[in-house]
Amino acid sequence: MKPIPQTEAELLQRANQIAGCSFAELAEEANMDVPLDLKRDKGWVGQLLEWHLGAPAGSKPQQDFSELGIELKSIPVSYSGKPLETTFVCVAPLTGVHGLTWETSHVRNKLSRVLWIPVEGEREIPLAERHVGTPLLWSPNDEEEILLKNDWEELMEMIVFGQFDQISARHGVALHLRPKAANSKALTEAYNINGKPIKTLPRGFYLRTQFTAQILQNAFNSLLNEE
């Protein structure tokens, strides 16, 4: 792994250095094998980018670059630059949730400063031939923060009241909640609507593609304005 970057500028410089490179080129330098596809290696792209950017490995409550307060997120995009899938933020707490606030939440911590790295994601492009795009450092503006906060508070209220069967993909404008488990047997503890302990699937917070598409579009527009 490359050394941990000491400044935001150093991290961004590294991200710019790998922009335009193929996964094959990056994997060769990192001495990593390129899988045929991502069905069994969903975290492979993230691990490859972490190696090149110097992120300490592992999924943690704090940001990937905790010393810099920056979270790393790869984002698979289509030929037209639109996100192809929702973006995982963090696991949702299902117990001990009374008294939690947006200001101290893991979601807000993770999204306070994000290094977005678009990557080619069209399935017809062999994994080894996919390329890394231009990086983007982002923090939510006031409008985005309000959207995220409102969604988080609505979803957490449903968790507090044990309304798991009522939470659907329709809830949330920018952020939504959905099961996160490799299989349906991986159950975790929670409380139902009557306050009784139950077992349910772990849930994760995800950013909707419409929200991340707007982030990328805004960045692209600001680049055009600079030119």
Curated annotation (Swiss-Prot):
Q: Which UniProt keywords apply?
A: Cytoplasm, DNA damage, DNA repair, Endonuclease, Hydrolase, Nuclease
Entry's localization field = Cytoplasm
Alphabetized InterPro entries for the sequence: DNA_mismatch_repair_MutH, DNA_rep_MutH/RE_typeII_Sau3AI, DNA_rep_MutH/T2_RE_sf, Restrct_endonuc-II-like
Main localization is cytoplasm
Molecular-function GO term, any one? endonuclease activity
Q: Which GO terms describe its cellular component?
A: cytoplasm
Q: Name one GO biological process term.
A: mismatch repair
The source's domain of life comes to Bacteria
The record lists the membrane-crossing segments as none
Similarity remark: Belongs to the MutH family.
Q: What does this protein do?
A: Sequence-specific endonuclease that cleaves unmethylated GATC sequences. It is involved in DNA mismatch repair.
By what name is this protein known?
DNA mismatch repair protein MutH
Species in which this protein is naturally found: Vibrio vulnificus (strain YJ016)
**The organism's taxonomic lineage, starting at the top:** Bacteria, Pseudomonadati, Pseudomonadota, Gammaproteobacteria, Vibrionales
